[in-house]
Amino acid sequence: MAYDHTQSVKEVLRHVLFRCGLSETLDVVRHWRGHYTKHTRERDMTGIFSQIYANGAWVMRENQDSLSGVGSTQVATRELSTQLSDFLREVGCRRLVDIGCGDFNWMRSVEGDFDYVGIDVVPKVIEENAAHHGNGRRRFLCADATRQLSVTGDVALCREVLFHLSFKDGLSLLRNVRSASFRYVLFTTDNAVWFNSDIRSGDFRRINLRRSPYGLPAPLRELADDKVSKGRVLGVWPGTALPG
Protein backbone atom coordinates (compact mmCIF):
# COMPACT_ATOMS: atom_id res chain seq x y z
CA MET A 1 0.00 0.00 0.00
CA ALA A 2 1.51 3.34 -1.07
CA TYR A 3 1.58 6.13 1.48
CA ASP A 4 -0.80 9.06 1.16
CA HIS A 5 1.80 11.79 1.59
CA THR A 6 -0.74 14.61 1.39
CA GLN A 7 -2.79 13.19 4.26
CA SER A 8 0.34 12.40 6.25
CA VAL A 9 1.56 15.99 5.97
CA LYS A 10 -1.87 17.15 7.14
CA GLU A 11 -1.41 14.93 10.19
CA VAL A 12 1.94 16.58 10.91
CA LEU A 13 0.26 20.00 10.80
CA ARG A 14 -2.60 18.76 13.00
CA HIS A 15 -0.05 17.51 15.53
CA VAL A 16 1.78 20.85 15.56
CA LEU A 17 -1.48 22.72 16.18
CA PHE A 18 -2.34 20.33 19.01
CA ARG A 19 1.06 20.67 20.66
CA CYS A 20 0.84 24.46 20.40
CA GLY A 21 -2.62 24.47 22.00
CA LEU A 22 -4.28 25.66 18.80
CA SER A 23 -6.68 22.79 18.09
CA GLU A 24 -9.56 25.24 18.47
CA THR A 25 -8.43 26.73 15.15
CA LEU A 26 -9.57 23.54 13.45
CA ASP A 27 -12.89 23.77 15.30
CA VAL A 28 -13.49 27.19 13.76
CA VAL A 29 -12.83 25.84 10.27
CA ARG A 30 -15.14 22.87 10.84
CA HIS A 31 -17.86 25.15 12.20
CA TRP A 32 -17.66 27.28 9.05
CA ARG A 33 -18.14 24.09 7.05
CA GLY A 34 -21.30 23.28 8.98
CA HIS A 35 -19.94 20.61 11.34
CA TYR A 36 -20.91 20.31 15.01
CA THR A 37 -17.91 20.97 17.28
CA LYS A 38 -19.28 21.82 20.74
CA HIS A 39 -18.56 18.31 22.02
CA THR A 40 -14.86 19.22 22.11
CA ARG A 41 -15.60 21.48 25.09
CA GLU A 42 -16.66 18.54 27.26
CA ARG A 43 -14.15 17.24 29.79
CA ASP A 44 -15.09 13.57 30.21
CA MET A 45 -15.66 10.68 27.82
CA THR A 46 -19.35 10.29 28.55
CA GLY A 47 -20.00 13.98 27.97
CA ILE A 48 -17.94 14.11 24.78
CA PHE A 49 -19.50 11.15 23.04
CA SER A 50 -23.02 11.76 24.37
CA GLN A 51 -22.90 15.19 22.72
CA ILE A 52 -21.72 13.61 19.47
CA TYR A 53 -24.69 11.24 19.36
CA ALA A 54 -27.26 13.74 20.64
CA ASN A 55 -26.33 16.28 17.96
CA GLY A 56 -25.66 13.92 15.04
CA ALA A 57 -22.05 15.05 14.75
CA TRP A 58 -21.12 11.90 12.82
CA VAL A 59 -24.06 12.05 10.41
CA MET A 60 -22.51 13.22 7.15
CA ARG A 61 -25.00 12.05 4.54
CA GLU A 62 -28.70 12.30 3.93
CA ASN A 63 -30.54 9.11 4.92
CA GLN A 64 -27.41 7.76 6.67
CA ASP A 65 -28.47 4.58 8.48
CA SER A 66 -26.11 4.91 11.45
CA LEU A 67 -25.47 7.62 14.05
CA SER A 68 -22.03 6.08 14.56
CA GLY A 69 -20.66 7.55 11.34
CA VAL A 70 -20.38 6.81 7.64
CA GLY A 71 -18.01 3.94 8.41
CA SER A 72 -20.74 2.13 10.35
CA THR A 73 -23.33 2.14 7.58
CA GLN A 74 -24.46 -1.09 5.96
CA VAL A 75 -23.06 -0.01 2.60
CA ALA A 76 -19.59 0.64 4.02
CA THR A 77 -19.41 -2.62 5.99
CA ARG A 78 -21.10 -5.25 3.85
CA GLU A 79 -17.86 -6.97 2.81
CA LEU A 80 -16.26 -6.44 6.22
CA SER A 81 -19.19 -8.17 7.93
CA THR A 82 -18.61 -11.26 5.80
CA GLN A 83 -14.86 -11.25 6.43
CA LEU A 84 -15.34 -10.85 10.18
CA SER A 85 -17.94 -13.62 10.30
CA ASP A 86 -15.52 -15.96 8.53
CA PHE A 87 -12.67 -15.04 10.88
CA LEU A 88 -14.72 -15.58 14.04
CA ARG A 89 -15.80 -19.01 12.82
CA GLU A 90 -12.24 -19.90 11.86
CA VAL A 91 -10.80 -19.15 15.31
CA GLY A 92 -13.74 -20.71 17.14
CA CYS A 93 -14.78 -17.53 18.92
CA ARG A 94 -17.14 -18.17 21.83
CA ARG A 95 -17.33 -14.61 23.17
CA LEU A 96 -16.76 -11.40 21.23
CA VAL A 97 -16.26 -8.16 23.15
CA ASP A 98 -16.99 -5.12 20.98
CA ILE A 99 -15.31 -2.06 22.52
CA GLY A 100 -16.95 1.10 21.24
CA CYS A 101 -19.96 -0.73 19.81
CA GLY A 102 -21.85 2.46 18.94
CA ASP A 103 -25.41 1.96 17.72
CA PHE A 104 -24.81 -1.68 16.70
CA ASN A 105 -25.82 -0.89 13.14
CA TRP A 106 -23.27 -2.89 11.15
CA MET A 107 -22.56 -5.61 13.72
CA ARG A 108 -26.11 -6.90 13.27
CA SER A 109 -24.89 -8.43 10.00
CA VAL A 110 -21.99 -10.36 11.55
CA GLU A 111 -22.85 -14.05 11.92
CA GLY A 112 -21.47 -16.79 14.15
CA ASP A 113 -22.04 -19.00 17.17
CA PHE A 114 -20.71 -16.70 19.88
CA ASP A 115 -21.87 -14.61 22.84
CA TYR A 116 -21.60 -10.88 22.23
CA VAL A 117 -20.81 -8.07 24.68
CA GLY A 118 -21.05 -4.53 23.32
CA ILE A 119 -19.39 -1.75 25.33
CA ASP A 120 -19.87 1.97 24.86
CA VAL A 121 -19.44 5.07 27.00
CA VAL A 122 -22.78 6.67 26.01
CA PRO A 123 -25.60 5.58 28.37
CA LYS A 124 -28.45 6.35 25.96
CA VAL A 125 -26.82 4.36 23.15
CA ILE A 126 -26.40 1.36 25.44
CA GLU A 127 -29.99 1.64 26.69
CA GLU A 128 -31.37 1.68 23.15
CA ASN A 129 -29.13 -1.19 22.04
CA ALA A 130 -30.24 -3.31 24.99
CA ALA A 131 -33.90 -2.54 24.33
CA HIS A 132 -33.81 -3.27 20.60
CA HIS A 133 -31.01 -5.83 20.20
CA GLY A 134 -30.32 -7.45 23.57
CA ASN A 135 -31.07 -11.13 24.18
CA GLY A 136 -29.73 -14.14 26.04
CA ARG A 137 -26.50 -14.20 24.03
CA ARG A 138 -26.17 -10.48 23.34
CA ARG A 139 -25.71 -7.87 26.06
CA PHE A 140 -24.59 -4.27 26.25
CA LEU A 141 -22.59 -2.52 28.97
CA CYS A 142 -21.99 1.18 29.59
CA ALA A 143 -18.32 1.60 30.48
CA ASP A 144 -15.22 3.64 29.69
CA ALA A 145 -12.62 1.12 28.50
CA THR A 146 -9.87 3.74 28.68
CA ARG A 147 -10.23 3.51 32.47
CA GLN A 148 -11.11 -0.13 33.04
CA LEU A 149 -12.15 -3.20 31.07
CA SER A 150 -14.05 -5.59 33.31
CA VAL A 151 -15.03 -8.24 30.75
CA THR A 152 -12.99 -10.61 28.64
CA GLY A 153 -13.52 -13.18 25.92
CA ASP A 154 -11.81 -14.90 23.02
CA VAL A 155 -11.76 -11.90 20.70
CA ALA A 156 -11.82 -8.13 21.26
CA LEU A 157 -13.05 -5.87 18.47
CA CYS A 158 -12.21 -2.16 18.60
CA ARG A 159 -13.11 -0.69 15.24
CA GLU A 160 -12.29 3.00 14.56
CA VAL A 161 -12.26 3.83 18.29
CA LEU A 162 -8.58 4.78 18.55
CA PHE A 163 -9.10 7.22 15.66
CA HIS A 164 -11.12 9.35 18.12
CA LEU A 165 -8.82 9.11 21.17
CA SER A 166 -5.80 11.09 22.28
CA PHE A 167 -2.48 9.28 22.53
CA LYS A 168 -2.89 9.11 26.33
CA ASP A 169 -6.39 7.64 26.22
CA GLY A 170 -5.62 5.36 23.28
CA LEU A 171 -2.57 3.84 24.95
CA SER A 172 -4.55 3.40 28.17
CA LEU A 173 -7.18 1.49 26.20
CA LEU A 174 -4.54 -0.75 24.62
CA ARG A 175 -3.08 -1.58 28.04
CA ASN A 176 -6.51 -2.44 29.43
CA VAL A 177 -7.26 -4.71 26.47
CA ARG A 178 -3.88 -6.40 26.94
CA SER A 179 -4.64 -6.99 30.64
CA ALA A 180 -7.94 -8.69 29.74
CA SER A 181 -6.03 -11.55 28.05
CA PHE A 182 -7.92 -11.92 24.77
CA ARG A 183 -6.62 -14.49 22.30
CA TYR A 184 -7.08 -12.09 19.40
CA VAL A 185 -7.61 -8.35 19.19
CA LEU A 186 -8.86 -6.45 16.15
CA PHE A 187 -8.13 -2.74 15.72
CA THR A 188 -8.58 -0.35 12.83
CA THR A 189 -5.31 0.88 11.36
CA ASP A 190 -4.58 2.97 8.28
CA ASN A 191 -1.62 1.84 6.22
CA ALA A 192 -1.75 4.98 4.06
CA VAL A 193 -0.41 7.39 6.71
CA TRP A 194 3.16 7.52 7.95
CA PHE A 195 2.65 10.01 10.79
CA ASN A 196 0.26 9.87 13.74
CA SER A 197 -1.02 13.14 15.19
CA ASP A 198 -2.19 13.63 18.75
CA ILE A 199 -5.68 15.05 19.31
CA ARG A 200 -8.21 15.79 22.02
CA SER A 201 -10.38 12.75 22.65
CA GLY A 202 -13.59 13.14 20.67
CA ASP A 203 -11.83 14.58 17.64
CA PHE A 204 -10.82 12.42 14.67
CA ARG A 205 -7.79 11.56 12.59
CA ARG A 206 -6.43 8.51 10.79
CA ILE A 207 -3.71 6.50 12.55
CA ASN A 208 -1.24 3.79 11.63
CA LEU A 209 -0.81 1.47 14.61
CA ARG A 210 2.62 0.35 13.42
CA ARG A 211 3.89 3.91 13.87
CA SER A 212 4.76 5.82 17.06
CA PRO A 213 3.49 6.02 19.74
CA TYR A 214 1.65 2.69 19.34
CA GLY A 215 4.40 0.67 17.68
CA LEU A 216 2.47 -2.54 17.11
CA PRO A 217 4.06 -5.29 15.01
CA ALA A 218 2.65 -6.28 11.63
CA PRO A 219 -0.81 -7.82 12.13
CA LEU A 220 -1.35 -11.54 11.65
CA ARG A 221 -3.86 -10.65 8.94
CA GLU A 222 -5.81 -7.70 7.64
CA LEU A 223 -9.53 -7.51 6.89
CA ALA A 224 -10.22 -4.96 4.16
CA ASP A 225 -12.14 -1.97 5.54
CA ASP A 226 -11.52 0.66 2.90
CA LYS A 227 -14.97 1.67 1.67
CA VAL A 228 -14.63 5.08 3.34
CA SER A 229 -10.86 5.59 3.21
CA LYS A 230 -8.34 3.79 1.02
CA GLY A 231 -5.65 2.07 3.08
CA ARG A 232 -7.86 1.41 6.11
CA VAL A 233 -7.95 -2.17 7.40
CA LEU A 234 -9.10 -4.07 10.46
CA GLY A 235 -5.89 -5.63 11.71
CA VAL A 236 -5.77 -8.88 13.68
CA TRP A 237 -3.14 -9.26 16.41
CA PRO A 238 -2.57 -11.79 19.19
CA GLY A 239 -3.60 -10.21 22.48
CA THR A 240 -0.01 -10.44 23.70
CA ALA A 241 1.15 -8.04 20.95
CA LEU A 242 -0.35 -5.03 22.74
CA PRO A 243 1.71 -2.86 25.10
CA GLY A 244 1.46 -3.95 28.72
Task: Indicate where each model-derived feature is located.
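Class I (Rossmann-like) S-adenosyl-L-methionine-dependent methyltransferase catalytic domain
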Residues: 3-153, 165-244
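A conserved beta-strand element that flanks and buttresses the S-adenosyl-L-methionine
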Residues: 157
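Hydrophobic adenine-recognition pocket in adenosine-nucleotide-binding enzymes
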Residues: 161
